[in-house]
Amino acid sequence: MAVQSTPKTLKEKLGGRNIFLIGMMGSGKSQTGPVLAKMINYAFVDTDDVIEKASKQSISSIFEKDGEKVFRDVEKKVLKEISQHHSLVIATGGGLVTLPENWGILHQGIVIWLDLDLRRSIKRLESDHKRRPLLLGDNLAENFSQIYESRKPIYLESDLRIEVEDQSPYEVATMVAEHLQSILIDQEPQAERHTTEL
């Protein structure tokens, strides 16, 4: 069997490229990101946290006061600023992928879609949907499903799709790290591959 990469060699193979976690709200990006970052000796950044700290207000407040367009513009600027740095695991807002210009930045790194199934996503969001401005309304499940279906073709532009069920953040991060190895091996020139078979 193949010898697994250590965190050090995985980091070396990444060459400082940022890892962007995308996916719907409630998919676990903010929980998985720090664990993954620790595994591969990267730093972790959450775009929503950066926006809230810089604006000194919650995401829902920005939506309510200024509207989604203003928020997306702020989000785009934050993404651009963060991407000036390297060796980061970056958890992005669920709708960040909807702006085509953001993909120019995302594709500079490795884009990983955490795809939590609809039933589990809705169950997670039922307790805190008031913090999710796009889900406000009478029918959370219907609103969520419509948003998911509209974004799914965009999420499919990712380099890697991880189907999430009931795994812990550690388990999801481990899955990501394992699949990252395969992606990086596929991207290596054939002559540079050094996987050892036992």
Swiss-Prot record:
One of the protein's GO biological processes: amino acid biosynthetic process
Gene Ontology MF terms in the entry: ATP binding; magnesium ion binding; shikimate kinase activity
UniProt keyword terms in alphabetical order: Amino-acid biosynthesis, Aromatic amino acid biosynthesis, ATP-binding, Cytoplasm, Kinase, Magnesium, Metal-binding, Nucleotide-binding, Transferase
Pathway assigned to this chain's UniProt record: Metabolic intermediate biosynthesis; chorismate biosynthesis; chorismate from D-erythrose 4-phosphate and phosphoenolpyruvate: step 5/7
UniProt function note: Catalyzes the specific phosphorylation of the 3-hydroxyl group of shikimic acid using ATP as a cosubstrate.
Family: Belongs to the shikimate kinase family.
Record's protein name: Shikimate kinase
Taxonomic source organism: Prochlorococcus marinus (strain NATL2A)
Gene behind the chain: aroK
